């Protein structure tokens, strides 16, 4: 019951259609990467690739540290996972060039504001430009809002300030206010990619984690935290 309530509330806040709960930001970003690959295979792409950004940080699992743009995080864990194409952050032309040269791309994974990369804030047209590129190429736009989500920027999601709707969005950190819970949310076609048994998490969506996340949502609403960010 708590898991269902949390899914409904967070989807209402974000405009998403479905939720998968796990225990950390790395886990939900791993979920997003797996979803993108599954989406690619469903579209007949044999070796699906995800565009990621220089100086990004997405986690420390093998796939997410590969997606991370920091050699210090990756050092000693080679060989890294294939299936990623890297572009400079805040450079639409570079992503356009990848679109023209690489026909195995199925998604973009990007932070609306880079945190560990140095608090890099993109130009106002960057996220809308990525949304347009994804629409034109039938890619998924996947936003890592582990750092920026949960009312930290004046809206529940940072991308909402740019008027951008992602296909997939990930949440953690402030989502449970210190309790280990994360969410991978998806909408439209992306929400229908996984079927029964496609993915799982032993403790994902456990009652205590969901209760903590619901209490955080209550506090955000009752204390008008978006107005005070």
Regions found by a protein language model. Give the residues of each.
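Conserved N-terminal phosphate-binding loop of PLP-dependent enzymes in the Aspartate aminotransferase
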Residues: 1-229
């Amino acid at each position: 019951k708590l898991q269902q309530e949390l899914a409904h509330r967070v989807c209402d806040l974000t405009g998403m259609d479905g939720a998968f709960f796990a225990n950390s930001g790395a886990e939900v970003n791993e979920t997003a990467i797996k979803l993108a690959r599954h989406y690619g295979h469903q579209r007949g792409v044999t070796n699906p690739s995800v565009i990621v950004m220089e100086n990004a940080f997405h986690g420390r699992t093998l796939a997410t540290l590969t997606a991370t743009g920091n050699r210090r995080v990756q050092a000693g864990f080679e060989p890294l996972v294939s299936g990623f194409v890297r572009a400079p952050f805040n450079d639409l032309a570079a992503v356009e060039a990848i679109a023209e040269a690489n026909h195995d791309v199925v998604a973009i994974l990007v932070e609306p504001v880079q945190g560990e990369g140095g608090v890099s804030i993109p130009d106002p047209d960057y996220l809308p430009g990525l949304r347009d590129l994804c629409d034109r190429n039938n890619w998924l736009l996947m936003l890592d809002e582990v750092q920026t989500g949960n009312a930290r920027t004046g809206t529940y999601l940072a991308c909402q300030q740019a008027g951008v709707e992602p296909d997939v969005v990930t949440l953690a950190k402030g989502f449970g206010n210190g309790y280990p819970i994360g969410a991978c949310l998806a909408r439209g076609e992306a929400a229908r990619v996984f079927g029964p048994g496609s993915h799982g998490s032993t403790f994902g969506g456990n009652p205590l984690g969901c209760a903590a996340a619901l209490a955080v949502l209550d506090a955000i609403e009752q204390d008008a935290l978006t107005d005070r960010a």
